[in-house]
Amino acid sequence: MILYKTSDLSYEIDSRTIFSNLDFEIASNEIYEIRGDNGSGKSSLLKILSGLNKMDNVYYDENLESNIAYLGHKNGFVEEISLRDNFNIIGAHVNDSLFKKFGLSKLKNHKFFNLSFGEKRKSALVRVIS
């Protein structure tokens, strides 16, 4: 089953061509790797595929839209408050089993700035999938 299909996909930022004339399909049950130098458009492509940047020539299975999340480079948490409070201020109600699954249960009441880089990334992942 084809999940995504692009046709002559091109993308520019500030009149600079990031990529052009991309034609590809992404099928279910396959693993893909996106590789390239810094600034080559990897994140831009993922933003397009996740729907953050809308493009006319990207076609996707409409059933996917509510199941797609994008975790960018920045965590987007308030450093001075607890992990739990960070989730509360955005209205995300995360059940304890998800915190436990990611090894964050004991850290819910810790200030975000005290978490390790990996714990912060796990927290960001929990936020996008909750």
Where are these regions (language model features)?
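Conserved ABC ATPase "signature" region
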Residues: N95-L107
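ABC ATPase nucleotide-binding domain "signature" region
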Residues: E33, K120-V128
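Pre-Walker A (P-loop) beta-loop-beta motif of ABC nucleotide-binding domains
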Residues: L22-E33
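Conserved ABC ATPase signature
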Residues: K111-K120
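Helix-to-loop junction immediately C-terminal to a conserved catalytic motif
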Residues: S50
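The feature captures the beta-strand-to-loop junction immediately N-terminal to the Walker
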Residues: R35-D37
